[in-house]
Amino acid sequence: MTDLTRLTIAEARAKLSAKEITAVELTDAYIGAIEAANETINAYVTVTPEKARAMAKASDARIAAGKAGALEGIPLGIKDLFGTEGVHTQACSHILDGFRPRYESTVTQNLWNDGAVMLGKLNMDEFAMGSSNETSYYGPVKNPWRAKGSNMDLVPGGSSGGSAAAVAAYLCAGATATDTGGSIRQPAAFTGTVGIKPTYGRCSRWGVVAFASSLDQAGPIARDVRDAAILLKSMASVDLKDTTSVDLPVPDYEASIGQSIKGMKIGIPKEYRVDGMPEEIEALWQQGIAWLKEAGAEIVDITLPHTKYALPAYYIVAPAEASSNLARYDGVRYGLRVDGKDIVDMYEKTRAAGFGREVKRRIMIGTYVLSAGYYDAYYLRAQKVRSLIKRDFELAFQAGVDAILTPATPSSAFGIADEDLASDPVKMYLNDIFTVTVNMAGLPGIAVPGGLDHKGLPLGLQLIGKPFDEETLFKTAHVIEQAAGRFAPSKWW
């Protein structure tokens, strides 16, 4: 039998439905792959083999009874940000040591309702703060990709680095992830996988550990566009427990795969041609434009004049919200507690020991920009810029543009513990330069592999869509995928 872990979700679904394989066989194949590779890749922080086998057994029973759900028997990895009832949920932070929620996040509950199987919890940047998966309390994740002729370990991107690496290394059929400033799309681009950040409000945030509440959005990382569409259909829903979730019908995203894009208008924003952008990224962008033109799309130049202010505005708004959200972690009711001489001393010692360096940095930035003397100068101004960024997109879409094409990242994956980036946080933050505008405007964005660079590492293209028009992104991304082909790393782990 061929390696079952190589099956896409769509292929596995067909084989399960035809009873050519069982959910238990498929799950066991992934558990075996995790046992063999996780010590090297470090994608999983918690593995749940007993739970997975029990869920798979129940899936087989439902398939036999003709009651299969949309994801029946499909083994998935869950980012450690999603609350999973009775299963360690730590946001990869020391401060949440030992926390086992008594609740299930809405997104994961939706997946289990559709028959999916949980393999375990995936590594990530601590509290989703990072672009390289190096801020995790559990240590960095290794990208399954390596440069040609090199043994250097590369980052998988962040914050959903565990999700992207697990999908690329065949350690799950698909994964949940979250995106606050690019945390789905950037790791997808770095690992040759597909990741979609849906419109803000498309997926419930209930039960997901908060980073920046007005920016966070859950979405899937998958091996191809069709699989991403299948997963998002199950993840998305309105939720009365999350007032920011939107009560709109969830389309059959998979039905949009293969549809023609003839006559569609694709916008190309000149502001995304940033200083110092590598020639390979520009060439990839031009190749993407050519593919869409060949498929019958009309290419139009557009302007998004406030793009250059997006990154500084994001790094004011996101830390401000994070400093408020993370104030709740004090060691009183759950997680880490470091004893002190009194309650204030206990708070201080717990937070000092529990939060990592990058999280502390962002809490301090957030507290500073919200302080009385700086609120107007920084936070209020950043929110005004955010409104202008959103307006730029609205004007482009009002002018008839159906989707916008940009690069997903300014480079391919870089090395773990890169000294240049470690010494300068701003250089690390620049990894988000093409992605943060989408979060600031609350729009959907998808990253799809476009090719390999001169080192043999994957590069991604990004498509940005109108609010709640993920269908257009899926059908357009599928055109790129068909033209570019699919990419998989050579196994070294």
UniProtKB/Swiss-Prot annotation:
Reaction(s) catalysed by this chain's protein: L-glutamyl-tRNA(Gln) + L-glutamine + ATP + H2O = L-glutaminyl-tRNA(Gln) + L-glutamate + ADP + phosphate + H(+)
Broad class of enzyme this protein falls into: ligase
GO biological process: translation
InterPro entries, per database record: Amidase, Amidase_CS, Amidase_dom, AS_sf, GatA
Record's protein name: Glutamyl-tRNA(Gln) amidotransferase subunit A
GO cellular component: glutamyl-tRNA(Gln) amidotransferase complex
Source lineage: Bacteria, Pseudomonadati, Pseudomonadota, Alphaproteobacteria, Hyphomicrobiales
Matches recorded under Pfam families: Amidase (PF01425)
Purpose: Allows the formation of correctly charged Gln-tRNA(Gln) through the transamidation of misacylated Glu-tRNA(Gln) in organisms which lack glutaminyl-tRNA synthetase. The reaction takes place in the presence of glutamine and ATP through an activated gamma-phospho-Glu-tRNA(Gln).
Organism: Sinorhizobium fredii (strain NBRC 101917 / NGR234)
Family: Belongs to the amidase family. GatA subfamily.
Assigned keywords, A-Z: ATP-binding, Ligase, Nucleotide-binding, Protein biosynthesis
Active-site residues annotated for this sequence: 79 (charge relay system), 159 (charge relay system), 183 (acyl-ester intermediate)
Enzyme Commission code(s) on record: 6.3.5.7
Assembly behavior: Heterotrimer of A, B and C subunits.
Entries under Gene3D superfamilies matching the protein: Amidase signature (AS) domain
One MF term in the entry's GO annotations: glutaminyl-tRNA synthase (glutamine-hydrolyzing) activity
Keyword match Cell inner membrane: no
Coiled-coil residues: none
